[in-house]
């Protein structure tokens, strides 16, 4: 039997947002030979019974928990998620001794502080597709893992943080997108999520994306992006949100993705939304977006 890794989505915010990172991470772990389970707590009102139920039937070598956001980004409610994360990790400690590894965009904003608050020892800041399988391999083999890229770990001086490894997204295989129940998220949340690139070179004072995704823009192949759209279309998901920091940067890549959507005949089948920068943005690009099925843009300034 392959060594089993449990991925946990602790995000119970509504309307629900699919944990895209866990779909990508599940593919990477599967390609490395691990058996992967997903415990998605989004659709349960109470998480304790679900954790108890899972561990009454399963044992795992490691647990990876994604923190997508540290709060709900809503001025009216200002719901801070880290205390609830600690409640969940404290509960996990009752039922398993497997290493708990934190990660995700929210975690990457302040990894040492979150690990300290939760009383945990390990996390991955930045991208996890390379580092998480390597870390789990070292844990299973009982080998030293302190040089794993992007690792944040407890040390004698408090916490140590390794530089991350940023992936070559052009050669990234198309994720299977079958770990997460994307169909349910679509039905209850309204759209699916997809990523065409990572990184942002801008230095906006309000934005944390460069902390999690880096400052160098790395683009996926347009074919790979649209292949992934096709995968989700097969399960009935036809509204998408591009999670890129700025979908139109660089403009040539945005254009090529749109042209590939049109070439594949998807533009009449889908509607999509994206974050964009107002500069550079042309009328020509706007027309192409509309032809490719774009239904809305959020401009950040």
Please name every model-derived segment.
Residues 4, 21, 25-28, 32-163:
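Glycine-rich beta-alpha loop elements in corrinoid/cobalamin-binding modules
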Residues 5-6, 11, 77, 148, ...:
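N-terminal [4Fe-4S]-dependent radical SAM core
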Residues 8, 66, 126, 154, ...:
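Conserved residues at the C-terminal ends of beta-strands
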Residues 9, 39-42, 211:
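Residue-level recognition of beta-strand->loop/alpha-helix junctions
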Residues 11-14, 42, 69, 246, ...:
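Residue-level signal for short, function-critical loop segments
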Residues 12-22:
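Glycine- and acidic-residue-enriched helix-capping/strand-helix junction motifs
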Residues 17-19, 75-79, 216-220, 251-252:
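Short, solvent-exposed loop/turn segments at secondary-structure boundaries
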Residues 174-301:
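Radical SAM [4Fe-4S] cluster-binding motif and immediate context
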């Amino acid at each position: 039997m392959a060594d089993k890794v449990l991925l946990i989505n602790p995000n119970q915010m509504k309307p629900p947002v699919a944990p895209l990172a866990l779909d990508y991470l599940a593919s990477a772990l599967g390609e490395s030979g691990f058996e992967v389970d997903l415990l998605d707590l989004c659709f349960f009102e109470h998480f304790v019974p679900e954790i108890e139920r899972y561990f009454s039937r399963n044992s795992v070598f490691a647990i990876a928990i994604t923190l997508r956001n540290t709060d709900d980004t809503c001025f009216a409610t200002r719901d801070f998620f880290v205390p609830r994360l600690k409640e969940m990790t404290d509960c996990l400690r009752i039922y398993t001794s497997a290493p708990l590894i934190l990660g995700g965009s929210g975690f990457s904003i302040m990894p040492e502080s979150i690990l300290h608050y939760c009383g945990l020892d390990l996390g991955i800041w930045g991208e996890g597709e390379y580092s998480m399988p390597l870390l789990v391999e070292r844990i299973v083999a009982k080998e030293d893992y302190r040089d794993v890229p992007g690792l944040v770990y407890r040390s004698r001086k408090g916490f140590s943080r390794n530089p991350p490894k940023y992936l070559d997204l052009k050669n990234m295989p198309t994720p299977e997108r079958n770990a997460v129940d994307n169909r349910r998220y679509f039905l209850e949340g309204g759209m699916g999520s997809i990523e065409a690139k990572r990184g942002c070179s801008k230095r906006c004072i309000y934005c944390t994306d460069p902390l999690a995704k880096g400052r160098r823009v790395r683009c996926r192949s347009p074919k790979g992006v649209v292949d992934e759209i096709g995968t989700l279309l097969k399960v009935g998901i036809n509204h998408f949100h591009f999670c890129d920091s700025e979908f139109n940067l660089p403009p040539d890549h945005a254009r090529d993705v749109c042209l590939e959507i049109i070439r594949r005949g998807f533009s009449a089948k889908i509607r999509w939304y994206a974050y964009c920068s107002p500069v550079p943005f042309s009328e020509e690009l706007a027309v192409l977006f509309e032809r490719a099925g774009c239904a809305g843009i959020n401009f950040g300034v």
